[in-house]
Amino acid sequence: TSNDFNTEGVKQFCHLLDSRQQADIFQQDLLHLYLNAQNELSTRALNTASIGAGATGVELAAELVTAKENFYKYGLNKIDPKKVKISIIEAADRILPALSQKVADHTMKQLSHFGIEVLTKHRVAKVDEDKIYFADGSNIEADLKVWAAGIKAPDVLTQLEGFEKDNIGRLKVFA
């Protein structure tokens, strides 16, 4: 289950990717974003943001690069792929904290090559319909936002007694 850390606006304005149904809704909203932009009189920049730079956030951003190119190829050509900004936002000082520094460094080079903006050391304080606000007072615009910043155990596990749990409520398993 996603852990929003009680960040204001996440539940209302961010997509979660905990289930196939949530992923399908994200896909539909991404397509609607492009279709609506295609039908606007003036072209504008589209901004997407993945909040969280673990495996989910990084992979999603990379897939959005392919998606923007495919949308253009398949007829949504009023939207210049160069005007589609893809951002990854991470509170920690680097991406992919569960992996080695070498893997993170290589991935950063690839993300840069794809034109993905990576903001590390940016803790999200609040999200609204149009923007993501950071603890330092700065903000960025984002039409479509995905919260991939952390996980926690399902709430049902809090009711289980007699089992040892870690700091985010997951059951400890001893093999």
Model-predicted regions and their roles:
Residues 120-133:
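A conserved short coil-to-beta-strand element within the FAD-binding core of flavoproteins
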Residues 3-56, 63-70:
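Glycine-rich dinucleotide-binding loop and its adjacent helix/turn
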